[in-house]
């Protein structure tokens, strides 16, 4: 044991000295540019970076991260010491995460248990969804909220249909409106929503609005002030004033939630902005998917919002008036389950449910996602499913909005294609849907991408659907999207140019950090 510790200490010290040497060379080389000519100052900088690199190396090692993440951070720090040092301070530090989110996790668990029904769904599940029993049990143990069989769901295709439904719903509000968004724009759509919220607030409707401080950093102060002055409570999620000193910058609220009077809700991939209506010159047509809910399951969506609200404001509003969603009677609705994922989860809830969905497949697995940075578990599950003869299809955009993620995603294509996965690139515009469909009777719609950031860092929310009418529309939409896509063929893809392979491999190396 002592020899092992000595070896670890020696390796970390060598790593720190290497980073320091790189730093010394870089600073010396650019000394004229940055105005440092005194050798003693260079020496002090070098010593400081030696100590910092050693301490960071120790922290990375002791955090017991996944080996790929540990190795990636050490490589980045070694090759790009200055960039790596500040990148780690911004995005890499993980040692306060447990303490930061421990209280929220406990409060969420208590609230979810308090409002989790005691109905025994087991007989109904076993009768209608025997092969998905494992998925139901897993969701229950991971802390997911109730499965509702008395909720109407409707798939909303693209921005026009989605925002027309949302605007109509906001106008119907009589008691309260709760909204939670990653990106809010001060443009035509944003202004239209703002005007409705102001009018509703004047009518006495309670309006609460959470927006992510980083995702909506371009949102004007006048937009926020106008809403606040009208009585709308507009609250930022994790505001960031000094990014380098604020480790919250890496944990963002990626959720998109609208709740109207506690009985109607919306969740999915669309943020608030004109580009989501296809009005961006670069992207053009914007392909996205949202879900409308009416009935019992809206209570689960409400709980997720109210717990986020309490986390940011300290205002506890778990009152019965907000949690009285009415069941929609009928035997044909199918099952709906809302699942919250985030850095406050002990288990990576959404990732594990994706994995269980893939593992439960008997005929088909269809995935639409704008970003594909899977971890080893998801990647292996998809390859094994394809090798077993299951129809595995992956639909992605043909043009990037984030080049690093785009090329890193493509680095996974060769091994997937070799295993028999069919990969398509959507060419009509930009594909932003976050959809998983298994065997045409099990699906997920939500905010979580098929990437490590959604699995580990972002606050997300997904609706898992079991044999609902909305799944049938999802299946048809997916088929329609394939008509607007081109299939990537394995032979042709393996012949792509060398510089593309190098770019993809380079970004693949950084994929644990993306």
Swiss-Prot record:
UniProt keyword annotation of Manganese present: no
Membrane topology designation: Multi-pass membrane protein
Enzymatic reactions: 2 a 1,2-diacyl-sn-glycero-3-phospho-(1'-sn-glycerol) = a cardiolipin + glycerol
Main localisation: membrane
Compartments where found: Cell membrane
Swiss-Prot/TrEMBL GO biological process terms: cardiolipin biosynthetic process
Domain PLD phosphodiesterase: 249-276, 427-454
Positions annotated as active site in the UniProt record: 254, 256, 261, 432, 434, 439
InterPro entries: Cardiolipin_synth_Firmi, Cardiolipin_synthase, CLS_N, PLD-like_dom, PLipase_D/transphosphatidylase
GN (gene name): cls2
Protein name: Cardiolipin synthase 2
UniProt KW Disulfide bond keyword: no
Pfam families from the UniProt entry: PLDc_2, PLDc_N
Organism, as annotated: Bacillus anthracis
EC code: 2.7.8.-
Ranges that cross the membrane: 7-27, 41-61, 71-91
Swiss-Prot/TrEMBL keywords: Cell membrane, Lipid biosynthesis, Lipid metabolism, Membrane, Phospholipid biosynthesis, Phospholipid metabolism, Repeat, Transferase, Transmembrane, Transmembrane helix
GO cellular component: plasma membrane
GO MF term set: cardiolipin synthase activity
Biological role: Catalyzes the reversible phosphatidyl group transfer from one phosphatidylglycerol molecule to another to form cardiolipin (CL) (diphosphatidylglycerol) and glycerol.
Family: Belongs to the phospholipase D family. Cardiolipin synthase subfamily.
Enzyme class: transferase
């Amino acid at each position: 044991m002592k020899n092992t510790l000595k070896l670890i200490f020696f390796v970390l010290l060598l790593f720190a000295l290497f980073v320091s040497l790189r730093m010394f060379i870089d600073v010396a080389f650019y000394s004229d540019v940055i105005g440092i000519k005194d050798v003693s100052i260079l020496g002090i900088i070098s010593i400081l970076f030696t100590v910092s690199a050693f301490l960071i190396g120790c922290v990375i090692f002791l955090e017991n991260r996944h080996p790929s993440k540990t190795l990636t951070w050490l490589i980045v720090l070694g090759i790009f010491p200055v960039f790596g040092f500040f990148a780690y301070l911004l995005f890499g530090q993980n040692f306060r995460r447990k303490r930061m989110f421990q209280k929220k996790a406990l409060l969420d668990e208590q609230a979810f248990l308090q409002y989790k029904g005691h109905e025994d769904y087991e007989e109904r599940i076993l009768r209608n969804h025997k092969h998905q029993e494992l998925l139901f049990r897993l969701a229950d143990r991971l802390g997911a909220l109730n499965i509702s069989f008395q909720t109407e769901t409707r798939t909303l295709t693209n921005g026009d249909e989605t925002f027309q439904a949302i605007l109509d719903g906001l106008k119907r509000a009589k008691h309260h409106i709760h909204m939670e968004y990653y990106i809010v724009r001060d443009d035509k759509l944003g202004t239209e929503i703002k005007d409705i919220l102001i009018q509703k607030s004047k009518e006495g409707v309670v309006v609460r609005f959470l927006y992510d401080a980083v995702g909506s950093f371009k949102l004007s102060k006048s937009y926020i002030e106008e809403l606040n002055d009208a009585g709308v409570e507009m609250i930022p999620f994790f505001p960031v004033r000094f990014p380098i000193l604020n480790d919250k910058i890496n944990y963002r609220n990626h959720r998109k939630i609208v709740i109207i009077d506690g009985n109607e809700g919306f969740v999915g991939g669309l943020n608030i902005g004109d580009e989501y209506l296809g009005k961006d010159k670069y992207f053009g047509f914007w392909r996205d998917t949202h879900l409308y809910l009416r009935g019992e399951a809206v209570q689960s969506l409400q709980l997720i919002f109210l717990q986020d609200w309490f986390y940011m404001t300290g205002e506890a509003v778990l009152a019965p008036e907000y949690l009285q969603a009415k069941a929609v009677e009928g035997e044909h609705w199918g099952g709906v389950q809302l699942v919250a994922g985030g850095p406050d989860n002990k288990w990576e809830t959404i990732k594990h449910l994706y994995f269980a969905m893939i593992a439960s497949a008997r005929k088909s697995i269809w995935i639409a996602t704008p970003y594909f940075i899977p971890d080893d578990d998801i990647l292996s599950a998809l390859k094994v499913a394809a090798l077993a003869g299951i129809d595995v299809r992956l639909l992605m955009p043909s043009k990037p909005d984030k080049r690093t993620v785009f090329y890193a995603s493509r680095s996974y294509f060769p091994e997937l294609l070799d295993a028999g996965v069919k990969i398509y690139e959507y060419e009509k515009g930009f594909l932003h849907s976050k959809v998983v469909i298994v065997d045409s009777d099990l699906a997920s719609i939500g905010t979580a991408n098929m990437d490590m950031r959604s699995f580990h860092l972002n606050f997300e929310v997904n609706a898992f659907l079991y044999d609902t009418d909305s799944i049938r529309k999802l299946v048809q939409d997916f088929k329609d999207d394939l008509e607007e896509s081109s299939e990537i063929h394995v032979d042709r893809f393996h012949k792509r140019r060398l510089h593309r392979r190098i770019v993809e491999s380079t970004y693949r190396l950084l994929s644990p950090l993306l």
